[in-house]
Amino acid sequence: MGPLTFTDVAIKFSLEEWQFLDTAQQNLYRDVMLENYRNLVFLGVGVSKPDLITCLEQGKEPWNMKRHKMVAKPPVVCSHFAQDLWPEQGIKDSFQKVILRSYGKYGHDNLQLRKGCESVDECKMHKGGYDELKQCLTTTPSKIFQCDKYVKVFHKFSSSNSQKIRHTGNNSFKCKECGKSFCMLSHLTKHERNHTRVNCYKCEECGKAFSVPSKLNNHKRIHTGEKPYKCEECGKAFNVSSSLNNHKRIHTGEKPYKCEECGKTFNMFSSLNNHKRIHTGEKPYKCKECGKAFNVFSSLNNHKRIHTGEKPYKCEECGKAFNQPSHLATHKRIHTGEKLYKCEECGKAFSQSSHITTHKRIHTGEKPYKCEECGKAFKVSVHLTTHKRIHTGEKPYKCEECGKAFNQSSALTTHKIIHTGERPYKCKQCGKGFSQSSTLTKHKIIHTKEKPYKCEECGKAFNQYSTLNKHKIIHAREKPYKCEECGKAFNKSSILNRHKIIHTKEKSQTLKM
């Protein structure tokens, strides 16, 4: 087999055939031919620019108009070719009247496609040619390109019309293996290989296998850290070219994929597909272990790690591992001290967006999560979930080391440090380590000299809340407010005022007597 050329991927029309296409079909043809040429150049195929491409780039017709005369509109092709080949009417018309007509000259005796049917007998003559073509189309996916020129052209035209077919909304090609439907035969063919292919390309680093070498090569970059695709705008690099293309839309603001249901737009087609499931309620990704279903494949993968216990994302700073990359990214901020999310009300900053959302409720006083058992309300849903365990007595978090159980996962995590002796929260000022982040926060106040806890009674300030509570006891013992009437002393002015009422009543009773 010779090297690939532009001729192998090009479709040519005569003036007669070109005039038979409508404007949309002509524009589609231009786009497909230009795309095919660009793909060859991208693949490094040494091709000189064909005259056809030059014409199309300049917006000219794909031939020399002076060499052709206007001809009458051709007759309709035999009715047998209007059955079952393509369910979409637009594609059916285009293929029947143009593509088969164009390739009839290759000499297939039974396919007299340049001649329209004028009688029943003549129509019967074409029946044999149609049956043979139809048989080719129903062959196995691996053999479809071994059929004659007619089937090859048939497949090429289906691919070139992929965008047009998508707009019809018809999914007419169904996979017999899993029932999934496709709007294009080529997409079904590609999908069916997933059922038959063996993952024979194995990663030597981790053992993961892939069906095609290109996917293995992309995967290897996870281990090597290679990111050959760099954004010229901001310098960010990616290990897959498609990721770079998607990233570029951040700079351009382009969101070409629109939801017909609610009008929301997206910069990735996959994001639109995932979004649509919000409207349909579809959850196609099901966990075989527990039956839980998800609307996004990545969510299923993350969920599976609950069963396997896998935690592939490890912190280089302290060695702690996580089952999701987002959890690792959040954790890293403990070490860096980075706080991206700032409250506009008071200026306080947080390392997680969920934390600032919760914090804002301090200012608004909102407590949307209410306990049906006792009526107590909470700012955060997880606090309500934890609170409910007081009523149920549930303690689902058990220490494997000593068997002690807890009603909060955070309490178990804190408890485990007793066994490990780990102190992951380190003070950058003096190097002292702590087992809990809250303890580190309290410790930092020693260096800042900050005293946020103020006594309302005397105005004295303290750096710890517990110290303030101890101080308050002093005021409880003191009794600076003395009654002038009887000499009795009190530690609060409000109590003294209530006491004075006793003397007022006594005086009024004396006057009555």
From Swiss-Prot:
It comes from Homo sapiens. Residues 4-75 form the KRAB domain. GO terms for biological process: regulation of DNA-templated transcription. It is found in: Nucleus. This is Zinc finger protein 723. Its main location: nucleus. SUPFAM superfamilies: beta-beta-alpha zinc fingers (SSF57667), KRAB domain (Kruppel-associated box) (SSF109640). The keyword Transmembrane does not apply.
